[in-house]
Amino acid sequence: MSEPIPLIVAQYELKGHPTRTEHWNLVAIISSSQTYTFEVRGNTDSFTYVAEPTPVPLNKILMYRGGCQVGGIPTHSLPQIAEMLGEIPIVKHDLSWDCQTWVILAIKLLKSAGFVFAQVDEPYVRERLLEDMNRWEEADLTVDERLLASGGESS
């Protein structure tokens, strides 16, 4: 049985949104060059759920601004998780619903299935994301870099 791979909430600089300054998604970090992304893309009238391998390491994505580890998942569970997250209803034409709303719903669902740490909730995520954004601004290591350097345990 393989060790669980880290599951993080990743944040990216977002421009032009009426209320948000970061786009969020969930990322399973398989290796330094291999990740799997779960997210809602689009705008309020076109939101779409996407689950796919990411062809570029996180630290090479120009808008990436760090993240926080929320859990761990077995690599063989990626298809199951992709299917589970695809069941989250997508709300269109409602300005109060966006990618951050979807990520919080996804965390709750994955927590109920045992893939997310017990202490993780929305305030936990927001606090850790702010901390990692500050690290990024200071050119310090972001969560993915810390996880890869330590073999899977974020500090």
What are these regions (language model features)?
Residues 86-155:
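Activation targets extended, charge/polar-rich intrinsically disordered C-terminal tails
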